[in-house]
Swiss-Prot record:
Keywords: ATP synthesis, Cell membrane, CF(1), Hydrogen ion transport, Ion transport, Membrane, Transport
GO MF annotation list: ATP binding; proton-transporting ATP synthase activity, rotational mechanism
Biological source species: Lactobacillus delbrueckii subsp. bulgaricus (strain ATCC 11842 / DSM 20081 / BCRC 10696 / JCM 1002 / NBRC 13953 / NCIMB 11778 / NCTC 12712 / WDCM 00102 / Lb 14)
Record's protein name: ATP synthase gamma chain
Topology relative to the membrane: Peripheral membrane protein
Gene assigned in the entry: atpG
NCBIfam families, A to Z: ATPsyn_F1gamma, PRK05621.2-1
Length: 320
C-alpha cells in the first residue's frame, strides 16, 4: 500500500478512536447533568420556601419593633430603616445592614477543575476580570474566593488577591460538602474582610444555553420588605417560639449558606451541560472528519487502480 493510503488509513483509525472517547464523555456528562438537574430542581423549591419564610419573619419582626416605637412604616421610608436601632447590634443587623462605605468586595467565583467544557470557564473568568476592572476604577479592592482549579490558577497567575481557594468539588455536590466553603465566605464577611459578597457563576438555563450571574449574597438585600399593610397580613401566619428574633438569628446565616450552595449547584449543572454540548460537537466533528478522510482514501485508491491498469495495458501493448 502506498504511503499516502497508509497514512490516511491510520488517521481514520485514530479519529474513530477519538470519537469513541468523546462519545463516551458525552454520555457521562449527560448522566451527571441529569443528576444535578434533579437535585437542583428539588433544592430550588426548598430555597424558595426558605426565602419566603425568612422574608415573612423579617417583615413581622420589623413591624413589631417599629410598632413599639410608634413608627409608621410606608413604602417611602423603608430604605431609611436603621437595623441597628431596630434589632440592636447583633447577627441580624450584621447580615442585613449595608456597610456605610464599601472599600472591598468579595467575589466567590465558581469555575471547573478541568477543560473540555466549551466556553464555561473562559466566560466566567472574562466577566470576573471586567468586575475587577470596575472595582479598580471606583477605588475598591477586589478579593477573590475561588472554587475550581481553573479559576484559581488563572487568578493567581494574574496576581489577583485570592483570599481563599477550594478545588475538587464533586460533580454532584452536597450541602455538607460545600459547607466549609460557604461558612468561610460568610465568616470573612462578618469579620470585615470585605464589605460585600457576590457569587459569580454560570447559571444553567437549559442544555444548550447558560448565562453569567453575579449575585449579591451579603448583606442580604432581597428579603421582601413591602408596605406595612402587606407585612401585617404576613405576620399572623407564624407562631414562633421563643421569639421571632431568636429564630431569625439562626435562620439568616442558614439562608445565606443555602443561597450560596444553590449557586454552586447551579454552576455545576451548567458545567455538565457545557461539557455534554462540547463532547457532542467534538463527536460530530470527528464523524465528519472520518467521512472526509474516507472519501480522500477512496479517491486515492481509485487513482492507484487506474494507474496500475494503465501500466498493465501499456505493458501488454508493448509486448505485441
Amino acid at each position: 500500500m502506498p504511503a499516502s493510503l497508509l497514512e490516511l488509513k491510520k488517521r481514520i483509525a485514530s479519529v474513530k478512536q477519538t470519537s469513541k472517547i468523546t462519545e463516551a464523555m458525552h454520555m457521562v456528562s449527560a448522566a451527571k447533568l441529569n443528576q444535578t438537574e434533579k437535585r437542583d430542581k428539588g433544592y430550588q423549591e426548598y430555597n424558595r420556601l426558605l426565602h419566603q419564610t425568612v422574608s415573612r419573619l423579617m417583615s413581622a419582626s420589623v413591624i413589631n419593633h417599629l410598632n413599639k416605637a410608634n413608627y409608621r412604616l410606608t413604602q417611602d421610608n423603608i430604605d431609611s430603616i436603621d437595623y441597628d436601632d431596630v434589632f440592636g447590634m447583633g447577627i441580624i443587623s450584621d447580615m442585613i445592614k449595608p456597610r456605610e462605605e464599601v472599600h472591598s468586595v468579595g467575589y466567590l467565583v465558581v469555575t471547573g477543575d478541568r477543560g473540555l467544557v466549551g466556553s464555561y470557564n473562559s466566560s466566567v473568568i472574562k466577566q470576573m476580570m471586567s468586575l475587577v476592572a470596575d472595582d479598580k476604577l471606583q477605588g475598591r479592592e477586589s478579593k477573590i474566593l475561588s472554587v475550581g482549579s481553573v479559576g484559581s490558577q488563572f487568578f493567581k497567575k494574574n496576581n489577583l488577591n485570592v483570599v481563599y481557594e477550594k478545588d475538587g468539588v464533586s460533580d454532584v455536590p452536597t450541602f455538607k460538602e460545600t459547607l466549609p466553603i460557604v461558612s468561610t465566605a460568610i465568616k470573612m464577611y462578618l469579620n470585615g474582610v470585605y464589605d460585600e459578597l457576590y457569587v459569580c457563576y454560570t447559571h444553567h438555563v437549559n442544555s444548550l444555553s447558560s448565562a453569567f450571574r453575579a449575585e449579591k449574597m451579603l448583606p442580604i438585600v432581597d428579603l421582601d420588605i413591602g408596605t406595612m399593610e402587606a407585612k401585617e397580613s404576613k405576620k399572623i401566619e407564624f407562631e414562633v417560639a421563643p421569639d421571632i428574633d431568636s429564630v431569625l438569628a439562626t435562620l439568616l446565616p442558614q439562608f445565606a449558606r443555602a443561597e450560596i450552595y444553590g449557586a454552586i449547584l447551579d454552576a455545576k449543572t451548567a458545567e455538565h451541560a457545557s461539557s455534554m454540548t462540547a463532547m457532542k460537537s467534538a463527536t460530530d466533528n470527528a464523524k465528519d472528519l472520518v467521512s472526509s478522510l474516507s472519501l480522500q482514501m477512496n479517491r486515492a485508491r481509485q487513482a492507484q487502480i487506474t494507474t496500475e491498469l494503465t501500466e498493465i495495458v501499456s505493458g501488454a501493448n508493448a509486448l505485441e
